[in-house]
Amino acid sequence: MQPTRILPDLQCSLMCEEVRQEANANFFLIGVLGLIRVPQLPVIAFKLSVFNRWTAGVGQFIETTRFIAPDQTTVLRKGEVKFSLQEAGQHATNVTVFTQVEFKIAGTYYVEVLVDDVMKLRYPVPVIHTPPPQPPSAPPVPPAPAS
């Protein structure tokens, strides 16, 4: 008997600056983010991409990807996509793009990945405020000799 529905496994989830697809259908990820370092706050990120790959499932599914604020309740961005896997040996790759994300405060933000409302992964994305270095102050100018 052939199973009609098996919830898939999340093979990977990576936040990056951009995802591109080559002519041969392979993906390459640009700027994989482990943290986000910013020189000032608030700041707006033009684009953040979340690359998710699913495998070992059978059926039709809805993936939900959420970007959560440091208070762990405010959903800053949310994306949903439908996908299907015909057999357990297949995989599906989804890319969710979040645009114009405003970081008002430093702290730990979170990416949550769900399939059919079942949480598969939640991982931290620290936003660190690192002000640019200040130029060294010039030494005081000695007074001009009196003539």
Regions found by a protein language model. Give the residues of each.
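Contiguous segments within soluble domain cores/interaction surfaces
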Residues: Q2-A106, Y110-S147
